[in-house]
C-alpha cells in the first residue's frame, strides 16, 4: 500500500536512549477510480488550478481543494476516502522524497573531488582536471563526473515505524528522511 505524506520535521523520543525520529503527516486523499490494485488518487496541494484540473474535479465529484493527482497502490476496492488502516500494522516503510536541491555545484561539492594544492603558486584549486584521453577516443566518455545541478533527485530509504497516530494522521519513523520540511513524498509499506 502507498500513501502521500508531508514531512513535518525531525524530533527525538523521550526514552533512554532517545531515538532520532522524523514526523510525517499522511495527506487526506480521495480514490477516484481503482483498477487491479492501482488507483487514481486526488490530494490537496496549494491552490493551483486550471481548466484541466477543474474538469477532473467535476468528473470525479471532488471539491476544489483536491487539485493534484497521483497513481498509487491502495487497499481500496472502490472510489471514496483512501483506506489508511494498513498503517496501524506497518513495521517498515519505504520512504521516497526528493532531496534538497543545491543548485549548480562544482565537482568538490558534488562528487567529493580532492581538488589541487592551495598554495606554492598552484593555479589548480577547485577544478576537476583532465576529462579525457588523447586522439582515441577523442571525446568525453559518458558518465564523466563534472560540475552541474546537484540535489533534487528522488531517493528511497527504508525506515522503521516508531508510532502512528491515526486520529491526527501523524506517522513517526526512525531516522532521517530526505527533503526539506513541508516537502511532499510517498511511502510504501514494506512489512
From Swiss-Prot:
Gene3D superfamilies (UniProt xref): Translation factors
Assembly description: Part of the 50S ribosomal subunit. Forms a cluster with proteins L14 and L19.
Region (Disordered): 115-137
General function of this protein: One of the primary rRNA binding proteins, it binds directly near the 3'-end of the 23S rRNA, where it nucleates assembly of the 50S subunit.
Positions of disulphide bridges: none
Keywords: Ribonucleoprotein, Ribosomal protein, RNA-binding, rRNA-binding
Protein's UniProt name: Large ribosomal subunit protein uL3
Similarity comment text for this entry: Belongs to the universal ribosomal protein uL3 family.
GO-annotated biological processes: translation
UniProt source species: Campylobacter jejuni subsp. jejuni serotype O:2 (strain ATCC 700819 / NCTC 11168)
CC terms in the record's Gene Ontology section: cytosolic large ribosomal subunit
GO-annotated molecular function: rRNA binding; structural constituent of ribosome
Amino acid at each position: 500500500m502507498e500513501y502521500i505524506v508531508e514531512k513535518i520535521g525531525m524530533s527525538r523520543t523521550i526514552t533512554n536512549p532517545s531515538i532520532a525520529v522524523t514526523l510525517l503527516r499522511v495527506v487526506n486523499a480521495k480514490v477516484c477510480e481503482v483498477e487491479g490494485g492501482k488507483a487514481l488518487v486526488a490530494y490537496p496541494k496549494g491552490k493551483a488550478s486550471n481548466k484541466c484540473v477543474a474538469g477532473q474535479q467535476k468528473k470525479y465529484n471532488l471539491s476544489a481543494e483536491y487539485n493534484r493527482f497521483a497513481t498509487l497502490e491502495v487497499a481500496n476496492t472502490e472510489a471514496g476516502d483512501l483506506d489508511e488502516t494498513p498503517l496501524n500494522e506497518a513495521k517498515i516503510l519505504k520512504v521516497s522524497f526528493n532531496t534538497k536541491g543545491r543548485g549548480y555545484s562544482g565537482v568538490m561539492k558534488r562528487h567529493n573531488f580532492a581538488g589541487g594544492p592551495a598554495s606554492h603558486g598552484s593555479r589548480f584549486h577547485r577544478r576537476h582536471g583532465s576529462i579525457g584521453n588523447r586522439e582515441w577516443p577523442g571525446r568525453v566518455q559518458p558518465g564523466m563526473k563534472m560540475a552541474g545541478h546537484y540535489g533534487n533527485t528522488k531517493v528511497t530509504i527504508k525506515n522503521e515505524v516508531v508510532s502512528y497516530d491515526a486520529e491526527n494522521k501523524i506517522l513517526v519513523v526512525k531516522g532521517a528522511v530526505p527533503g526539506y520540511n513541508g516537502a511532499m513524498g510517498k511511502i510504501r509499506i514494506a512489512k
